[in-house]
Structures are given as C-alpha cells and as structure tokens.
Design a protein with these regions (language model features):
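Non-transmembrane, aqueous-exposed alpha-helical and coiled segments at domain scale
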Residues: 1-371
Length: 371
C-alpha cells in the first residue's frame, strides 16, 4: 500500500470551480488577474456559485439579497456581549457564531437546491457582521448595522470602523476579497467537502472549514507577517533581521507555496495596493520594508512572496486589527466553501480514504488481573 503524506499531488475529486495550472489561478476559466482588476466581489460570488458571470439584473438581485440578509440575530450579539471574548481568538468566536447561525435558521436541515442557495446567501451575507460585531464589542463599542446602499467590501469596512471608506480603500479590500475567494482543494475546502459528503448540512460544512482555517499551517500567515514587520520596525533594521533569520535557517512567513513554484499570481495585486494604501496613509515604511524583505529573501532562496505577504500591510493600512486577518480570509473564502459544498451535493460520494496500519501485529487479549 502506497502512502502519500498530506495527500500532496493526489487528485481527490473533479471540480468546475477553480484551477491552478502552471502557476495560473482561474475561477471558472477566468484568469485571476482579469478578475482582480475588473470584477466586484459580488460578481465573483455569483460566478463561483453559478459557474458563469451575472448579467446586470442578476448582479443587482444578488446585491439586494445580500443586503437584506446581512443583519445578525440578536442572540449572537448578546452572546458576544455576555462571553469574555477579550480572551478568545476571533477565529474561535467566528467558528462558534457560524455554528449558532444554523440554530436560528429554520431551513438549516432542508437539503433541496433552492433551500441550499438561500442558506448560502444568509451565510455569505452575515459573516462580515459576525467579524465586525466581534471586533467592536470586545473594544466596548456597539456593532454597526450594515447599510443597504453599500456594496459588500464597502459595508465591511464601514461596519468595522464606523467611517465611510475612501474609494482606494474600497478598491483594495474588494481586490483582496476577490483574490482570496477560492483556491481549488485547499485544506479548509477539502474539510468542507468531506463534511458535507456525509450529507451533513451547509452550516456544519462551513463550521468545519473554519476549524481547519484556524490552524496556523493554513490561516494566520499574514498575521505573522505583520508581527514580523512590527518587530523590525524600521527600514534600516530589515537587512540584519532577515539575514539573521536566514543564517539560522528560520522560516520567513509569507514566502513560498505548496502548489505554486514560480510565484503566487495573487501577490502582485496586493503588492500594488500596499504601495497605494501606505502612501495614502503616510506610512510608506510598511511597503518599503516589505519590498526590502522580498529582495533579500528571493536573493538567497527560490521562494517568491505568496498572497499572505503583502496582504498583511494592506489590511494593516485599512485599520484592521492583526488578529482579524484570518477571519477576513474566511469572509472571502466563504464564497468558495459554499461553491464547493454545492458542487459536492450535486454529485456526491462519501469521501472515505484508507490508512496504512503501522501498529503492532495480532495480539491476544490479557485479563486485567494478569497485566
């Protein structure tokens, strides 16, 4: 029996949602570069769920449905207020809150196609409110209700900080959402598909995916990148800090990727937004330090930056707390998780691999008195 640790290189299913071929990422055949430069996140949601881009009426209908379903049940807000959430990592709070949503959804266990689409809308609509409500309540602030005249990216930033974001900020966050929406069969997406392949409900599948994303080997890299940038603090300290890390064979977060060999195609878009945002905010050092780190690392190792590296300075420049970086990943990836859940339901087969047994050989039971 041949064992492939971590299932690396194993093709476990067929999918029409996204592909990574020769370091090119596509959603339903559309190059990520094309989508990042031109598409709204709402268009990408529709694309992933319907395998085609929407027309104008379909896009407006989706936006209206997301806006109409964006408010949280009061029970979740009260839960955040009662629980000592200052001691909880936001991913733990997000996992619990999404699971709670299922308790208040009368269609949670209704499995027909139309009910699943309605649940998809509710989940995608409410996850920004969960993250922003958590963020504000732990600071002693009241949650801010979403505005129906704002788009998805604009509403998130508004609910987080209470200020109307600038066009540059909206563009940057929309681009980040588009870039993180799906990524083929990553760990959290595979987890969601394994869960719903048992014919469990959508809330269970998404909750399982969030649990997988919570692990530091999947989510959290951009949070670690920002921690590194804060430790370095100045452009003058970069060279000594990075060379010391590399000399001691320590890992530099935000570089390299399990799938991409020549480079993550998403990184350049966030690099550009990092430059624009840090200049606009009068804090160019975060971009300058990042580019210097990239120069030093790539001069010594064949490891180009991945999507996490420049997203750190982008999110920081948008006024987002560092421990919210991974929950924001979930806000975007919710669209991809749902797309894969819907696809799994459509052509389902229980996912049940085998394991190579490496324990002791056959043994005879010994009564406890004789042990």
């Amino acid at each position: 029996m041949s064992v492939t640790k971590g299932l690396e290189g194993i093709v476990a299913t067929s999918s029409s949602i996204s592909s990574i071929i020769d370091d090119t990422l596509t959603y339903v055949g559309y190059d990520i570069d094309d989508l990042a430069e031109n598409a709204s996140f709402e268009e990408v949601i529709f694309l992933l769920w319907n395998l085609r881009l929407p027309n104008h009426l379909e896009l407006e209908d989706l936006k209206n449905q997301l806006a109409a379903n964006a408010a949280l049940p009061n029970e979740i807000i009260e839960y955040f207020k009662m629980y000592p959430i200052e001691k909880v990592h936001p991913m733990g709070a997000l996992r619990t809150a999404v699971s709670m949503l299922g308790l208040y959804d009368e269609e949670a266990d209704v499995m027909d196609d139309q009910a699943n689409l309605r649940k998809a809308i509710r989940l995608q609509a409410k996850i920004p409110a969960i993250v922003t409500a958590f963020s504000r309540i732990r600071k002693g602030l009241e949650p801010i209700a979403p505005r129906k005249d704002f788009g998805y990216a604009q509403n998130f930033l508004y609910m987080l900080n209470g200020n109307e974001p600038s066009q540059v900020e909206i563009e940057a966050f929309n681009k980040a959402l588009v870039l993180h929406a799906d990524h083929e069969l990553n760990a959290s997406t595979f987890t969601a598909r394994v869960c719903v392949a048992t014919l469990s409900d959508m809330y269970s599948g998404v909750t399982a995916a969030i649990g997988a994303l919570k692990g530091p080997l999947h989510g959290g890299a951009n949070e670690a990148v920002m921690k590194m940038l804060k430790e370095i603090d100045t452009l003058e300290n970069v060279e000594a800090y990075i060379n010391n890390k590399l000399d001691n064979k320590e890992k530099i977060m935000g570089f390299g990727h399990r799938v991409y060999r020549k480079g993550d195609p998403r990184a350049k878009h966030l690099r550009e937004m990092s430059k624009r945002l840090t200049d606009m905010n009068g804090e160019p050092k975060w971009y300058e330090m990042s580019t210097k780190i990239e120069e030093l690392v790539t001069s010594r190792k064949p490891l180009p930056p991945n999507v996490d590296f420049y997203s750190a300075s982008v999110y920081h420049s948008l006024g987002i707390d560092h421990d919210l970086f991974t929950p924001i990943f979930a806000v975007s990836r919710m669209s991809g998780w749902i797309a894969h859940i819907l696809e799994q339901y459509e052509n389902n087969r229980l996912i049940r691999p085998r394991a190579e047994y490496v324990g002791p050989g056959m043994q005879k039971y010994v009564p406890i008195e004789e042990r």
